[in-house]
Amino acid sequence: MAHKKGVGSSRNGRDSDGQRLGCKKFGGELVKAGNIIYRQRGTQIHPGNNVGCGKDYTLFALIEGVVKFERLGRDRKKVSVYPS
């Protein structure tokens, strides 16, 4: 049994596809009810006024309006939707 792999073979060459996380609607943008605002793993950003949170922590608009990102104290952020 060879203790070296044959020439040309490699243990590299794999990479998984990205998960398309992040901000989908930015501050000041108009959204409709149900529009996804932010996709995340865990609550990097918390839901504020008129924003729902899915079981995978996706934040989505509950009403039609304008997106606004705000601070929750020193180290937390929230996103709200206000009627336009």
From Swiss-Prot:
GO terms for molecular function: structural constituent of ribosome. GO terms for biological process: translation. Coiled coil: none annotated. NCBIfam families: L27 (TIGR00062). This is Large ribosomal subunit protein bL27. Keywords: Ribonucleoprotein, Ribosomal protein. Pfam families: Ribosomal_L27 (PF01016).
